From Swiss-Prot:
It comes from Cupriavidus pinatubonensis (strain JMP 134 / LMG 1197). The keyword Oxidoreductase does not apply. Its EC number is 4.2.1.96. This is Putative pterin-4-alpha-carbinolamine dehydratase 2. It catalyses: (4aS,6R)-4a-hydroxy-L-erythro-5,6,7,8-tetrahydrobiopterin = (6R)-L-erythro-6,7-dihydrobiopterin + H2O. GO terms for molecular function: 4-alpha-hydroxytetrahydrobiopterin dehydratase activity. NCBIfam families: PRK00823.1-3, PRK00823.1-5. Transmembrane segments: none annotated.
Length: 100
């Protein structure tokens, strides 16, 4: 797997509102805020199950109702289609839990 070209990256990120580039790294990130800890944990569980199936795992940080996620493909040393695919799944999971 190879990192996305700058043109492909820009095109694909345009479909993922709120996802931003990570400074000094070929990765993207987004913060999700939920009504409470239970909703945040339910979201993380859904993402974890999908990540395990895809054998592609996010970097994340959780405090109470907030989940910060960073995506990058370590084997490719950069952002790949796998990250974009996981970001789309994450968006659907967040929407199903009515993220704030």
């Amino acid at each position: 797997m190879t990192p996305l070209s700058p043109q492909a990256r820009a095109t694909l990120l345009a479909e993922l509102p709120g996802w931003t580039d990570v400074d000094n790294r070929d990765a993207i990130q987004k913060r999700f805020t939920f009504p409470d800890f239970n909703a945040a944990f339910a979201f993380m569980t859904r993402v974890a199950i999908q990540a395990e199936k895809a054998d592609h795992h996010p970097e994340w940080f959780n405090v109470y109702n907030r989940v910060d996620i960073t995506l990058s493909t370590h084997d490719a040393n950069g952002l790949t289609q796998r990250d974009i695919d996981l970001a789309h799944f994450i968006e659907r999971a967040a929407a199903s839990l009515r993220v704030e």
